[in-house]
Structures are given as C-alpha cells and as structure tokens.
Amino acid sequence: MPLSLYNTLTRHQEPFEPLEPGHVKMYCCGVTVYDYCHLGHARSYIVWDVVRRYLQWSGYQVRYVQNFTDIDDKILNRARQENSTMQAVSDRFIQAYHEDMQRLNILLADVYPKATDVIPEIIQLIQTLVDQGYAYAVDGDVYYAVDRFPDYGKLSGRQLEQMQAGASGRVDDTEPKKRHPLDFALWKAAKSEELSVYQPWDSPWGKGRPGWHIECSAMVRKELGHTIDIHCGGMDLIFPHHENEIAQSEAATRADLAHYWLHNGFVNIQGEKMSKSLGNFKTIRAFLNSGVDPMMLRLFVLQAHYRKPIDFSDETITAAQHSWQTLQEGLRFGYDYGQQLRWEDYQDSSFGDPACMRIPDSGAEIERFRAAMDDDLNTASAIAVLFELAKELRREGNLISHAGQPQLDPQELRSIWQTLVCLAQVLGLEVSPETEVTADDGLSEAEIEDLIQQRQAARKAKNYAEGDRIRNELKTKGITLIDQKDGSTKWIRD
C-alpha cells in the first residue's frame, strides 16, 4: 500500500503523489520567537520531523524548510518590556529553540528563513496583490481584501459570513480603516512607540513592517517555489494563518500553494487545553530539566496519532516512562551483550550506527512498520512493532544474564537488534553506548550497582538480614538478583 495522508484541504485521506517523482518540497510553519518553546511546539516539531524522516527512509529527497517569525507584535512588546530590541529578543529565542530541538533529536531543517531576510520579496508580493486588486492601502497600512478571493475559507471549510475576525489574536477586527472585519494586514505602518526597539523598512506605502501571514507566503515562494508538496503546522494555524497564506499566494501566482495540508492535534494538560491564561503552560526546557528523558517525551508524542489531541498528565507520563524503559533496553541490547555474543564488529567505531547496518528491505516486522506509517503516519501502530522486537530482546537478555546464553542464535539476535535500531531511528528514537537505562521506579544502573555492593558488604560482614533486606527492596522495584558461583551478583529486570 502506498503512503496516504489526510489532507485538511480535501478532508480525505489521499495517496501521496509528489509534484516531482522522488522529490518532496515540505514547509513547516515555525515559531514566533518571543518566548521559550512549549510542549505544544514539541509535539508539532517531533511529528513533522518524523514525517520528514519517514519520507527520506522511503527513498524521497526532501527539502525541508521551516521559518522563524522574527517580526511580530509579541516580539516588539517583549523588547519594549525588557528595554531591548526586536533583533536581540528574536536572536535569543532562536538560539533557545535550537537548543530545545537538539535535545529532542529533531533534525535541522535544510534552511531556516527569517521574515527579516525576505523584506524585498514581501514588498514585491504585496505590490502584486495591490496591483491585481486583492489588497488596498490606507494611511500607510495595506490590507488584504478577503471578499476579493472567491476561495477564501476552502481550507477551514467555512463561509466568509461564518468566520470570526481576530481568531489569531493578531487582528484588530474593529479597525475602522478596513473594508471588511476579516481583512488582514499585509503591511503595518510604523508607530512612534515602536521605533525604540526596531528600525522600520521603507516601502511604497511608507515606513513600516510586514504582517504575520504575508511573511510565510514570501518565504515559501523564495525557498520552494509557487507550489509545494506538503505544508504543515498545528491545527490552530488552519484559520486564519494558513487560510490567509492560501489567499495571498494563490491570488498572486494563480497556482495552488500546496497539494497536501497536514495539521497536528492539540496538547492538553491534565484534561485542559494548555494555555498561559489557565496557568498550565509548560516549556520544553522546564519539562526536560525536571529530569525527564527527552526520548521519553518523543515516544510519548508518537504513541498517539498525530491528528488526535494528547493529554499530559501524571498518569500518561508515568506510563510513557515505563514504555521508554522497555524500548530503551531493547535498543541497548547490542551494546550490553554484543561482546558476550561475539558479534565480530563489536569493537568497530561504527557499531550501533544505523547508517552502517544492513537490514533486509522486507520482512514481517519491516512490512508491518511500513504499513502502519503508510496509513496516514500511524506512529502508534509502528511503535507497537518496535515494542515486540524490544520485548523479545529483553527476554533474551535476561536469559544471557541468568543462564549465560540466549535461546536464539546470536546472529538472529543481531538481525533483530539491527532491525529495531534502524526502525526506531526512523522515528528519531535513539540511544548511545553511554545511555544509562533508568528503571521504572527511577533507579539508575549506577544506583542498582551501589545497592548490590552494599549487600555484598553486608553479607561479607555476616549481616545476612541486611543483605536480605536489600535483595527484597530491589525485588519490589522489579530487580531480581542472581548470585553467581564465583561470588559475584548479576541482576535483571523482571
């Protein structure tokens, strides 16, 4: 079955057919850089990172573009509050964005255009819309006339009279200069109170700065051309942002902006939509700095279908931690047991690198993984395949620790492990030789070994009661100790 994707534009799941065979042009709306990224951003960029990875794994050459909105009222307001400048604020949070995404193992985009990089292209695009009658200038501002574009509303499925102005929080629907409440700004005249934080740009309509929506239209056009394959973002961007992008770009070029529009679902916190007003707003860095493994967060996001809402709660995070431990143990299998199984390349520097592994193009697990991903990127079903492989490796690891040898042939185990590692990398789930497995209760390998040493010391001192207490404590936490004939102690997870 070929890859099929749910297209917001058509409201149907459709076979994916790129404009140019073997090549994909993909644009993702990036962040407005006035604050640290939150968990909603984490979900969105993890999802689109996986889409890109899967397309590349499937043989496509993907050009992936993701912008930064570095001109916006929110940035200007923060700059004024901090007695800083728009550029200083945006530079700081662009750097913070990259730090957060690196921790989440999100691949770098091919290019990160900024709105400030494309001011000439923005002005040219606005002029085209004015010349063609889709936009009008009033006192230094330029507005898009939504009633001039017959297809306005086709992405969100709304009629013009059903829409609510100001849905983005960036539009003043009471502005008397506008002909229609839904008309939106393409160019904003400079205001005296803003001049201390940014230098306005010259334009045919006077000094000012671009509006939010026109920035993306100009960046898509410059980096990818008039028509692209995939345009993606969060569901909150469907209206008005993506609706307005379509209106601008398609009015100017007379061509479809994108063939496939993909949108990920919302993030809820303890059952409520995450928002600053409710006080349940969580940033990525604060969440990860609390001790959460970034790969666990990534796994948590991918265990739900990308179009459905997900709920961050104590219960769901705990469940995800348990799931990551299981998968982590499977991914570490080669590092933990490769030498004991006498895999010939164990000492090679490339050992464990998925790019250097040779796995078959077909096989039951690979075909099931591919079928899941081809079905509108069903990562939940794809991860179920990974868990089956990881649990099998976990059982074999317990046998090696307990009996000294596995049940399966070492080369068969090697094939299972390499398949798991390679498929997990398609989802961006990775470990390294230095990765330390953390038990469900929070005990690290080092902590377990320390307790074992305490037990051995107690037994050496003939304090058998203390030794039994430590053994029982570990047992309640899912750790079984196996005393060896030579006096050493091995441990396995139950």
Curated annotation (Swiss-Prot):
Xref: InterPro entries: Cys-tRNA-ligase (IPR015803), Cys-tRNA-synt_Ia_DALR (IPR015273), Cys-tRNA/MSH_ligase (IPR024909), CysS_C (IPR056411), Rossmann-like_a/b/a_fold (IPR014729), tRNA-synt_1_cat_dom (IPR032678), tRNAsynth_Ia_anticodon-bd (IPR009080)
A Pfam family annotated for this UniProt entry: CysS_C
Motif ('KMSKS' region): 273-277
CDD domains in UniProt: CysRS_core
SMART domains recorded: DALR_2
Motif window: 'HIGH' region: 31-41
GO molecular function, a single term: zinc ion binding
Residues binding ATP: K276
A single cellular component GO annotation: cytosol
Catalytic activity: tRNA(Cys) + L-cysteine + ATP = L-cysteinyl-tRNA(Cys) + AMP + diphosphate
Keywords associated with the record: Aminoacyl-tRNA synthetase, ATP-binding, Cytoplasm, Ligase, Metal-binding, Nucleotide-binding, Protein biosynthesis, Zinc
Main subcellular location of this protein, as a coarse class: cytoplasm
Residues holding Zn(2+): C29, C216, H241, E245
A single BP term in Gene Ontology: cysteinyl-tRNA aminoacylation
Cofactor: record remark: Binds 1 zinc ion per subunit.
Family: Belongs to the class-I aminoacyl-tRNA synthetase family.
Quaternary data: Monomer.
Protein name: Cysteine--tRNA ligase
Organism: Cyanothece sp. (strain PCC 7425 / ATCC 29141)
